[in-house]
From Swiss-Prot:
Pfam families: Ribosomal_S6 (PF01250). Residues 115-185 are annotated as: Disordered. This is Small ribosomal subunit protein bS6. Keywords: Ribonucleoprotein, Ribosomal protein, RNA-binding, rRNA-binding. Belongs to the bacterial ribosomal protein bS6 family. Disulfide bonds: none annotated. GO terms for cellular component: cytoplasm; ribonucleoprotein complex; ribosome. GO terms for molecular function: small ribosomal subunit rRNA binding; structural constituent of ribosome. It comes from Desulfatibacillum aliphaticivorans. Binds together with bS18 to 16S ribosomal RNA.
Length: 185
């Protein structure tokens, strides 16, 4: 058994269900010939370097699989006939592979990917909790600052009458002075 990679570009205007049918057809073909799909990666719609069958964009898909050489001829024949596929390329990546070793390698890669996703999720959760804590602290500081400003705003209002009283006192003093002039005369 050999290991292959096939990349094909399908029509980007295909409806999602039609595209899914095409992908299932390719995966089923590999399974029919006792092959094993290591991974099936959809890259999505991308701009093509040049027009292919009057299309400027294509939907890219990468398949990594193990199979016998007879499958490749049949798969390429089907890809040439199918109008939904714009272009394809198949390369052999390994001459002889142990299917159990490939399955183990794929399982290990999946476990590492899941662990990385779990670690990323935990890190995101920790960052979210820290952001919430910082927001709560900021809100508490703002409330505390507002509480300090409120009594300070009330205090000048109480001091204002005291400031008016000295202003009245000098006004009374000149009134007394003329009285003292009359008494002297």
């Amino acid at each position: 058994m050999r290991r292959y990679e096939t990349i094909f570009i399908s029509d980007p205007d295909l409806p999602e269900d039609n595209r899914a049918t095409l992908f299932e057809k390719m995966q089923g073909l590999i399974a029919e010939h006792d092959g094993y799909i290591a991974f099936f990666d959809e890259w999505g719609a991308r701009k093509l370097a040049y027009e292919v069958k009057k299309k400027k964009r294509g939907y890219y898909v990468l398949m990594d699989f193990c199979a016998e050489g007879s499958l490749i001829a049949e798969m390429e024949r089907i890809m040439r006939i199918d109008d939904r596929i714009l272009k394809f390329l198949t390369i052999q990546t390994e001459e002889e592979v142990d299917l159990d070793a490939v399955k183990e390698q794929v399982a290990k890669a999946k476990a590492e990917k899941e662990a990385a996703q779990k670690a990323a999720a935990e890190k995101a959760e920790a960052a979210r909790l820290e952001a919430e804590k910082a927001a709560e602290e900021e809100a508490a500081k703002a409330a505390e600052a507002q509480a300090k400003e409120a009594p300070a705003a009330e205090a000048p209002a109480e001091e204002a009458p005291a400031a008016e009283a000295p202003a009245e006192a000098p006004a009374e003093e000149p009134a007394e002075e003329p009285k003292s002039d009359e008494e002297d005369a």
